[in-house]
Amino acid sequence: MPSNLKTNFLTRHPLMAVFLFTFICLLPAMLMRDFTPSNELRYLSIADEAIANGNIFAFYNHGLPYADKPPLYLWIVALCKLFFGQHSVLALSIFSLIPAFVIVWLMDKWVMSDASSSDRMAMAMMLITSVMFLGTAVVLRMDMLMCMFIVLALFTFWRMYELRLDGEPEGEDAVVYRKCSWLLPIWIFLALFTKGPVGLLVPPVSIAVFLLVKRKPRDIARYLGWKTWGVIAGLCAVWFIGVFLDGGVSYLDNLLFKQTVGRAVNAFTHSKPFWFYAVAILWCIAPYTLLLIGSLILSVWPRRKNAEAGSISAEAVKSDKEMLFLCVIASTFVMLSSFSSKLPVYLVPMFPFIVYLFPMAVNRCGCRRWAAWAIGVPAAIFALVGIVACLVLFGVINVEPLDATWKEYPFAFDPPIKIAAVLLTAGNLLALWFLVRRKVWNLPVFLVGSSLLLTVYAASGVLAKVNPYFGYREICKEVPMGTDVATLCLHRPENIDVYVGRQIKDYGKDVEAFMKTASDTTNTRPMSLITTYKCLEENPQLRDLLYSSGPVASVGPYCVGTIEKHKK
């Protein structure tokens, strides 16, 4: 009976099973990990400042305008702080993970409605465990939320397009069409309101390119006409008025011109060459790179003619849906490559369409021998990596060049890491076995993805020991109350006010400037210094000053000591 129930659950709710499994595997990491200094702490600090100052549309980071991002995600961060009373990694991670699940659900509904449960589970696992998609689903960024709205917009357009295939929609179809005609601009605006111009551009450009390819240029105005742009413009007007009232003309100018035109044309940050994404995408969709690039090539391969009839073979005729996916991928890739500012995470809106193009191409052309190799190669690499890791972790072989690394990170030999290595090895060996014996693609893909999630789940057991190496929460707990706080030789420490509850002074790597401040007796307030042991080793004078002032607390590679000042 339990076996039947299990089978029925997987058959009737394949996506729910994948979502539940993914959530369980990622839950320990979401519960225990620290915030990263580069972006996550900055969003928290901005939200704290907005709450303190009562800002709604204009945001500031330590008093400086922060017009880099629209307000929607920062509202979420602020509301979570107000609701829970503190910043929670778990609560904020949910706003990345749930949009990821919504995207998978939409793509499954769009493409896999007639597929088997095993194929649906494999495709869901493939998208979820693609490197960049998985990373974006657990980090605290607005990219996954924007991607969800982009997919919703394009899915809504597709419904409208299907309803018009046989002419003007009538009856219930007309009601659905009218609803979609309102939803389309709302989804586009929400994508814009989440991340910025990319959210505004991807859906309309993709729609326009698709209709041009289908030789229906006049239909562009049907979907992207006055109504669509009027709704978007009206919502933007409300937003911009709020920005003007909250931040003034200078903030509005910063939002509309410096952050938009500046990043697109002559980026002041993240500037990369035109070909950057052609390389980045190869690792962003790993471990399914060979499979997905292969299906992309298969999909765009020139049409073949029937030698006898002189006509185009049936397998060469792409469906409108497949053509739309290709247009989304191509137009988004070219558009993003033309922008000056580039980061791998900006590619996230393409990934659902790259992944779910695979079943359409395979169903049309057949699953050929290359697909088995495309799955088997990464599975074999993971299995080999897992075997080597097990041999090292269990002491079977000794790698002398890594001895210094093991001493610095002793938790690498903890049981959770060993279990993670075993799970990675076992999962991919099973994937290879099923690939050879059953000669199917779905189960091996599911096993490769599952092994990655189980590896993350097991390795999360050492997060408490890993946190001090990539976050500042633990070292900030050692900072005493009532002192000025200074930092030296730290990476992006400006937002640790989230932890210490007061503004800090960052000296970068300028040890001389800090020593001068420390010797100034005009300010008698004690000063706590957060720095690294490496910095102390390289600067004996600083080390002597800190250790002579009292006890020095250490957490991971960081240390904190308090310097007492006295008037002469």
Which role fits each region the language model picked out?
Residues M1-A371, K439, K465, S549-P557:
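Membrane-integral, polyisoprenol-dependent glycosyltransferases
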Residues P2-N4, W182, I186, S299-K568:
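Membrane-embedded architecture of ER/inner-membrane glycosylation machinery
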